[in-house]
Amino acid sequence: MTRQNLFPPEGMQDYLPDERWHKRRVEAQIRELFSLCGYDEIETPLLEYCDVVSGGGGRLPVEQLFKTFDRSGSVLAVRPDNTLPIARLIAGRMKDVPAPIRVSYVQDIVQYPLPKGGQMRAHTQAGIELMGEGGAQADPSRTLWNLDRALTACLEPLLKESAVSLT
């Protein structure tokens, strides 16, 4: 094993037992907050079809994705963000769920270009999505969004140490 192979690739991170425990503790607190506010946790696969996360409409160019192929030759990409895979899940498997749909997530993402500000290439992203509700009815969720921002500010030191980000 070469010296280079003793360390993870650039922008990736190993977790020692105490680091892993700390990260999981922060994630559990975030999950509990989202649940208390009426958001149900969902999970999407780490690999998505490339066209789900690439192209126009604010999606990343194909060149900025980690890509691989499945056995049938379809191009797959490691998710660089959670919003589009969650929109795919809601449009597909949750299309018959009555609105409003409130979901939360705490899952890993991997970004190809190294993010600015020393952020790791691979990290955990936590957030909420509200689908199918607008106007005055969305006000409680706007409050939650503001709480989400406040939580980010308050937990910033913990989040940096634990490689969890709120979106």
Where do the model's predicted regions map?
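TRNA-recognition modules of translation machinery and tRNA-sensing kinases, especially anticodon-binding
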Residues: 1-167
